């Protein structure tokens, strides 16, 4: 309905198999913005989203170091064998700012941030430019918020709506791509974990509620609970991150 009412960009624009970075987004978004202004548009709205990508467009990024494939493969092996929690805590120790701003439920993003930290000895977040790049347009930041209880209720209901609209079928159709970065995100990972349990690849034997971690995803209901919880946690981190930006004008819905 929203897509039909207003022209949107960067939706259905890339495939899950494409490697996409904040640096690429900065370049492509600036090119699009300049074109739209040249066509006569006076005001453009950027809606989101990932703090890292918004910073890339608003302030620009320094050049990030090239990937260390051996280190990345080692970290990806740890992610697969140990899960994301240990990597998260390592990132939290090495780079608290990145821990607070990236989607830490996305194992691929945690791996990339850790890769840069370990390879350079500097925080991943330090590569965000300390001096904002000049843009040829004015930027006004508007933040939308609502009471926490209402926000969480809307998140919970939205997840249920996503399932009713075919989330499980969508994820099932993407199973062969599950290791790609684009699918290491909240909403996909939990469903994949449920599929693994259903296929007998994961056992609940020996697991109790006191066992560290989330345990096996033994039902769709459990997957939905985890998606709701992880989305709430992500929203909380986003609010904390944006709350430190004094240039934002906040509106309560």
Describe each PLM feature range.
Residues 1-253:
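Phosphate/pyrophosphate-binding catalytic cores of soluble transferases and nucleic-acid-acting enzymes
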